[in-house]
């Protein structure tokens, strides 16, 4: 044996092994496979093609050994992140620290979530279908088992689809597509039509070399396999502290936070701020923002010059400032309707501001328009700016917000005019009596 071989052997022996549960022998899955080959053959096919099968990780490693016949299927355990952590400790630990882990808490915190149809909530046919990847308490998991047929307690399979559980699949941008698309978060559409997405497509078709830079969602949001998946501006592009030396932006951000119910009419924190903290939906310190911004900048500079990358991020921040001014003006117009009695403030609203988190449950057309302005058009402009998609910024975001504000102002004028006419007619009717 050469000295080099000996050195390599010693080095490998000294390397700490990744924590991994001793896998089930593949033969132990034979009984499960024999039955499920007939009842659910594609599940078996996926498992057989998986890395799990190659390593001898069998059905009972994840589902337990209590289910043995067709009459006791309810005894099969449904895996949760702790099941995966038996072998994938670092990845699950990163997930638990990150944004996706708070997805269930975030959707449950919405003030009108309980108004929605059961199938939309716990039935996983609407909001719950994506937000179910978040961690649940024992009580929440029990509730899901009672209302959703026992499903929805898993998390990792949102990206590593069962029963293949492929790392290669989860590394592709399409893995993000199911949840990050559509009305309020069309990141897929933005990415796919951006230069980043286009180059990824061209790389796949071998139109450009295999060595070409072609960032995917994971390149920018899961650097080196980081499962925390955080961004500096968070999901809604709101954060603390307020900008120093910029009174206009500070005033606008205060108004938006009042519309979100995070600040009261005096600008003081409400109980919702604690909910925001618990759900980790926003960066609430400069240090937290700077940490995520530094990670983003480091990623950008792998393909771009540092000066260009910094300027693009700066331009994105500046756009949010301008979007916030339009949004705050819209909120102030609707709040003014409450204040002068033109609109009755809903009894369940804690302050004389429209509650942006009621979303489509907003009670009047003008408040519905404000909801669309916030959750569709502001989101598209903000997200488009950071997904290299100028068309989304302009025509699906900025332009629509300008139109929203014009229509909100016109609606407010019409509501006040109608109220004045009604008062005059009522006074005239009384004078005739």
Residue ranges and their predicted role:
Residues 4-16:
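Hydrophobic h-region of N-terminal signal peptides that target proteins for export
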Residues 17-37, 428:
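Short N-terminal segments immediately surrounding and downstream of signal-peptide cleavage
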Residues 21, 42-54, 68-124, 133-425, ...:
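Primarily the internal scaffold of c-type cytochrome electron-transfer domains
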Residues 37, 129-132:
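Small Cys/His zinc-coordinating "RING-like" fingers
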Residues 62-65:
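Intrinsically disordered linkers and flanking regulatory tails adjacent to Zn-binding modules
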């Amino acid at each position: 044996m050469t000295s080099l071989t000996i050195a390599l052997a010693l080095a490998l022996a000294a390397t700490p092994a990744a924590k991994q549960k001793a896998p089930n022998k593949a033969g132990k899955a034979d009984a499960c496979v024999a039955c499920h080959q007939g009842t659910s053959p594609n599940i078996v096919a996926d498992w057989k093609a998986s890395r799990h099968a190659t390593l001898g990780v069998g059905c009972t490693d994840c589902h337990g050994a209590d289910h043995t016949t067709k009459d006791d299927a309810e005894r099969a355990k449904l895996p949760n992140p702790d099941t995966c952590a038996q072998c994938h400790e670092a990845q699950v630990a990163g997930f638990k620290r990150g944004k996706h882990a708070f997805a269930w808490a975030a959707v449950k915190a919405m003030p009108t979530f309980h108004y929605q149809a059961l199938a939309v909530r716990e039935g996983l046919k609407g909001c719950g279908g994506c937000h179910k990847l978040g961690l649940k308490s024992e009580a929440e998991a029990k509730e899901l088992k009672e209302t959703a047929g026992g499903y929805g307690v898993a998390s990792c399979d949102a990206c590593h689809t069962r029963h293949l559980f492929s790392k290669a699949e989860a590394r592709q941008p399409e893995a993000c597509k199911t949840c990050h698309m559509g009305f309020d978060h069309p990141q897929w559409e933005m990415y796919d039509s951006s230069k980043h997405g286009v180059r990824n497509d061209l790389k796949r078709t071998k139109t450009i070399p295999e060595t070409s830079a072609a960032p995917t969602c994971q390149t920018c949001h899961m650097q080196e396999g980081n499962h925390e998946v955080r961004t500096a501006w968070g999901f809604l592009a709101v954060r603390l502290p307020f900008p120093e030396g910029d009174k206009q932006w500070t005033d606008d951000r205060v108004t938006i936070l009042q519309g979100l119910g995070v600040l009261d009419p005096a600008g003081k924190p409400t109980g919702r701020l604690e909910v925001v903290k618990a759900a980790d939906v926003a960066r609430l310190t400069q240090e937290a923002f700077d940490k995520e911004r530094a990670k983003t900048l480091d990623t950008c500079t792998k393909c771009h010059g540092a000066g260009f990358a910094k300027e693009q991020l700066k331009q994105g921040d500046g756009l949010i400032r301008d979007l916030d001014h339009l949004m705050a003006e819209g909120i102030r117009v609707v709040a003014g309707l409450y204040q002068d009695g033109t609109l009755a403030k809903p009894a369940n609203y804690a302050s004389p501001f429209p509650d942006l988190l009621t979303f489509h449950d907003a009670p009047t057309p003008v408040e519905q328009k404000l909801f669309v302005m916030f959750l569709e058009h502001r989101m598209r402009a903000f997200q488009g700016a950071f997904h290299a998609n100028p068309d989304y910024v302009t025509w699906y975001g900025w332009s629509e917000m300008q139109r929203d504000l014009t229509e909100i102002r016109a609606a407010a004028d019409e509501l006040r005019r109608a109220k004045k006419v009604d008062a005059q007619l009522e006074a005239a009717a009384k004078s005739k009596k």
